[in-house]
A protein has these predicted regions:
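Single conserved hydrophobic/aromatic residue that forms the stacking wall/gate
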Residues: 1-12
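Short acidic-hydrophobic, aromatic-tinged amphipathic segments that line or gate anion-handling sites
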Residues: 14-21
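Structural preference for solvent-exposed beta-strand-turn elements
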Residues: 26-223
């Protein structure tokens, strides 16, 4: 009915869920929306991240650093979350601010989307890729800490400075309120980094999964 349609206006702006997936509808009814959007603008960068923990691995990533985009895509696909990231950074100065601020906003999105963390697994871990082996232990328990046991032989992979990998995860830990232990070894630096990001994504996938109804802590809260 065209007249009714005009009266309702733009329905898409009002609805909280738009999907033809029964699986996603079921998850939404049980857990509610776990989708957030955060924008952060400084004199150095402008970062916008949209994260849906109840997603299906869809992503659109544009940071200005091709290899970094490739790594962030691994997070979306292997964690099974929908992720949109748009970054305008001062790359003419350095890659540091772009990588750091992306990690900060991504971590904030996870912290906000998880909310009280009711019903989640909380913990996650994972592993390998070709010659490289990576292990990531993750706890979304609210305590921030990073243990980094990764040796990278090359200074750059593509347009990405490898020293920023550790800084990315350190920044994510702080804003995402999580504990990360990452270790990896191998011959090819590209493979090592990709194994780390994929293992991280698989750990995230396990940790954010909702399997119960209570807070996964004897304290009764996670903060």
């Amino acid at each position: 009915d065209p007249e009714m349609s005009r009266g309702l206006g733009d329905v898409y702006k009002r609805q909280v869920l738009h999907t033809d997936s029964w699986r996603e509808i079921t998850r939404f009814i049980i857990s509610g929306s776990r989708k957030v959007r955060i924008c952060r603008k400084t004199a150095e960068t402008e970062v916008t991240v949209t994260l849906n923990l109840n997603g299906e691995g869809c992503c659109s990533i544009k940071t200005g650093l091709s290899f970094f985009d490739h790594m962030l895509e691994q997070i979306a696909r292997h964690a099974g979350v929908d992720l949109e990231i748009g970054v305008r950074g001062d790359l003419k100065v350095d890659e540091h601010h772009t990588v750091e601020d992306t990690a900060i906003v991504l971590g904030e999105c996870f912290a906000k989307a998880l909310g009280s963390k009711k019903g989640i697994e909380r913990y996650g871990f994972a592993l390998p890729m070709d010659d490289a082996k990576a292990e990531v232990l993750l706890d979304f328990g609210g305590r921030t800490w990073l243990e980094w046991g990764v040796t990278l032989k090359r200074e750059y992979v593509g347009d990405f400075p490898t020293e920023m990998a550790r800084h990315f995860f350190a920044s994510f830990c702080q804003s995402g309120q999580c504990n990360l232990h990452i270790s990896a070894q191998g011959e090819n630096t590209h493979h090592i980094l990709e194994a780390v990001f994929k293992a991280f994504a698989r750990a995230v996938r396990q940790a954010i999964r909702q399997t119960g109804g209570g807070i996964p802590s004897s304290k009764g809260c996670l903060a």
